[in-house]
């Protein structure tokens, strides 16, 4: 099994950055408290507060799938109401089940491992 990473670019609706950050805090707290196979979940904001880049790092494709199934529905609804997905990139060995789950995000670019330090 290989680790899986994802990079998601979200466009923040004008004036909604604080709500998006609140949702992000919920996701990060939940992962820290109850999802040991989520290795990292980080949100980065551009200087204008218009774009958020999410870096996700999972122990495996199964861990990413489990995270998607465990997401707080209220926080997910808040994020969906105040952002739009600009792009999604997934890195690592992914399963058909994970691909199916990610299909709801729109077009997803997948990259398989080629060369790595680890």
Residue ranges and their predicted role:
Residues 1-52, 59-70, 81-118:
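Short S/T/G/P-rich N-terminal loop/turn motif that feeds into the first structured element of a domain
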Residues 72-76:
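A short, acidic, amphipathic alpha-helical segment used as a generic capping/interface helix at domain edges
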């Amino acid at each position: 099994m290989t680790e899986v990473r994802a990079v998601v670019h979200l466009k923040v609706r004008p004036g909604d950055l604080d709500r998006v950050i609140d949702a992000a805090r919920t996701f990060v707290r939940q992962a820290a408290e109850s999802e040991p196979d989520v290795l990292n979940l980080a949100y980065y904001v551009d200087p204008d507060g218009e774009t958020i880049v999410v870096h996700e790092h999972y122990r495996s494709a199964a861990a990413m799938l489990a995270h998607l199934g465990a997401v707080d529905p209220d926080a997910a609804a808040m994020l969906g109401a105040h952002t739009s997905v600009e792009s999604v990139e997934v890195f690592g060995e992914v399963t058909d089940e994970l691909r199916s789950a990610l299909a709801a995000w729109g077009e997803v670019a997948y990259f398989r491992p080629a060369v790595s330090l680890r």
